[in-house]
């Protein structure tokens, strides 16, 4: 497999820029609606979530899917019109409210049974998270992301040089932004909420993406050692093509079980797997088209009249 990297450099950057703009736009709309870049789940905002499933779902003979507007009207009738409502796989209902005591919960279940149909009491799930715990969990997740990025910068600076580290971080931030933008869109269009597993997914994506980038950078360094008289673009193109098959195969084999989890897993695991699929695909793309071309541009700009030389750091 042969890729003419710099032939596709401009189209790749145009696509990347469009995806970044779409992601930022989606997160801006989410911020206006939810005061967060995506629809926050119970883990982050706190409150109580009540999940119920229609009794007919077990025998697969329900006459119609649950209608969100109808549920909102019923909840409004019991004084809970400001609840967040989500329908899962047509026949399962998830209701989130900041406060939902026992009396309110019983009133909701009674109203829903009368207005929509009989819900199976054995499938009822109730989760409660305090607002303080939710905020602390969010802060801990963000702190973990920041620490991981700082650790990557230090590691890559020691193993290679600072400019390698900077452009690798730019590629990682791109992967995180694209994944967050996708879930901002899912939240706006499909009501998908983000929970603590999403932060775990972002950390996993960062680790996967930096691994791809390190492999390519390692080939860049080796090629510079052997061919210090080569043009920088030639060096980068050669390094990318040496690792291209490996990057694609690794991504595909990693994504196959994630696709299975997405198709057959529970709701939380389903969107966790989807985040990883998006992030891993973005990681392969950014390590090939972003981290490398940025580094090549910087090296040519820094010494345009000099033949490329590399001060190789010993690992």
UniProtKB/Swiss-Prot annotation:
<keyword id="KW-0813">Transport</keyword>
<dbReference type="InterPro" id="IPR022813">
    <property type="entry name" value="SecD/SecF_arch_bac"/>
</dbReference>
<feature type="transmembrane region" description="Helical">
    <location>
        <begin position="12"/>
        <end position="32"/>
    </location>
</feature>
<dbReference type="GO" id="GO:0015450">
    <property type="term" value="F:protein-transporting ATPase activity"/>
</dbReference>
<keyword id="KW-1133">Transmembrane helix</keyword>
<dbReference type="GO" id="GO:0065002">
    <property type="term" value="P:intracellular protein transmembrane transport"/>
</dbReference>
<dbReference type="GO" id="GO:0006605">
    <property type="term" value="P:protein targeting"/>
</dbReference>
<keyword id="KW-0472">Membrane</keyword>
<feature type="transmembrane region" description="Helical">
    <location>
        <begin position="136"/>
        <end position="156"/>
    </location>
</feature>
<comment type="function">
    <text>Part of the Sec protein translocase complex. Interacts with the SecYEG preprotein conducting channel. SecDF uses the proton motive force (PMF) to complete protein translocation after the ATP-dependent function of SecA.</text>
</comment>
<dbReference type="GO" id="GO:0005886">
    <property type="term" value="C:plasma membrane"/>
</dbReference>
<feature type="transmembrane region" description="Helical">
    <location>
        <begin position="166"/>
        <end position="186"/>
    </location>
</feature>
<dbReference type="GO" id="GO:0043952">
    <property type="term" value="P:protein transport by the Sec complex"/>
</dbReference>
<dbReference type="InterPro" id="IPR022645">
    <property type="entry name" value="SecD/SecF_bac"/>
</dbReference>
<keyword id="KW-0811">Translocation</keyword>
<dbReference type="Pfam" id="PF02355">
    <property type="entry name" value="SecD_SecF_C"/>
</dbReference>
<keyword id="KW-1003">Cell membrane</keyword>
<feature type="transmembrane region" description="Helical">
    <location>
        <begin position="188"/>
        <end position="208"/>
    </location>
</feature>
<dbReference type="GO" id="GO:0015031">
    <property type="term" value="P:protein transport"/>
</dbReference>
<keyword id="KW-0812">Transmembrane</keyword>
<comment type="subunit">
    <text>Forms a complex with SecD. Part of the essential Sec protein translocation apparatus which comprises SecA, SecYEG and auxiliary proteins SecDF. Other proteins may also be involved.</text>
</comment>
<dbReference type="InterPro" id="IPR048634">
    <property type="entry name" value="SecD_SecF_C"/>
</dbReference>
<keyword id="KW-0653">Protein transport</keyword>
<keyword id="KW-0997">Cell inner membrane</keyword>
<dbReference type="InterPro" id="IPR055344">
    <property type="entry name" value="SecD_SecF_C_bact"/>
</dbReference>
<feature type="transmembrane region" description="Helical">
    <location>
        <begin position="271"/>
        <end position="291"/>
    </location>
</feature>
<dbReference type="Pfam" id="PF07549">
    <property type="entry name" value="Sec_GG"/>
</dbReference>
<feature type="transmembrane region" description="Helical">
    <location>
        <begin position="247"/>
        <end position="267"/>
    </location>
</feature>
<comment type="function">
    <text>Probably participates in protein translocation into and across both the cytoplasmic and thylakoid membranes in cyanobacterial cells.</text>
</comment>
<protein>
    <recommendedName>
        <fullName>Protein translocase subunit SecF</fullName>
    </recommendedName>
</protein>
<dbReference type="InterPro" id="IPR005665">
    <property type="entry name" value="SecF_bac"/>
</dbReference>
<comment type="similarity">
    <text>Belongs to the SecD/SecF family. SecF subfamily.</text>
</comment>
<dbReference type="InterPro" id="IPR022646">
    <property type="entry name" value="SecD/SecF_CS"/>
</dbReference>
């Amino acid at each position: 497999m042969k890729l003419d990297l710099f032939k596709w450099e401009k189209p790749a950057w145009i696509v990347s820029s469009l995806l970044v703009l779409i992601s930022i736009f989606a997160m801006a709309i989410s911020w206006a609606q939810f005061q967060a870049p995506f629809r926050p789940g119970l883990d982050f905002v706190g409150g109580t979530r009540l999940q119920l499933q229609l009794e007919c779902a077990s025998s697969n003979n329900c006459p119609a899917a649950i209608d969100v507007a109808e549920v909102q009207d019923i909840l409004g009738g019991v004084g809970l019109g400001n609840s967040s409502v989500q329908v899962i796989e047509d026949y399962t209902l998830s209701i989130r409210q900041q406060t939902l005591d026992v009396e309110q919960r019983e009133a909701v279940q009674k109203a829903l049974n009368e207005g929509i149909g009989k819900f199976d009491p054995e499938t009822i799930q109730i989760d409660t998270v305090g607002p303080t715990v939710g905020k602390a969990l969010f802060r801990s997740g963000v702190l973990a992301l920041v620490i991981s990025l700082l650790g990557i910068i230090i590691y890559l600076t020691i193993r290679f040089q600072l400019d390698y580290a900077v452009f690798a971080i730019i590629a990682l931030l791109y992967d995180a932004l694209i994944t967050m933008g996708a879930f901002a869109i899912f939240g706006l269009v499909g009501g998908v909420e983000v929970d603590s597993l999403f932060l775990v997914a972002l950390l996993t994506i960062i680790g996967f993406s930096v691994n791809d980038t390190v492999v390519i950078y390692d080939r860049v360094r080796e090629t510079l050692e052997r061919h210090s008289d080569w043009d920088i673009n030639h060096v980068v193109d050669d390094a990318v093509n040496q690792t291209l098959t490996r990057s694609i195969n690794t991504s595909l084999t990693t994504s196959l079980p994630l696709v299975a989890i997405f198709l057959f897993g529970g709701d939380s695991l389903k969107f966790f797997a989807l985040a990883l699929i998006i992030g891993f695909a973005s990681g392969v793309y950014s390590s090939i088209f972003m981290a490398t071309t940025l580094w090549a541009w910087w090296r040519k700009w820094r010494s345009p009249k000099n033949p490329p030389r590399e001060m190789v750091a010993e690992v």
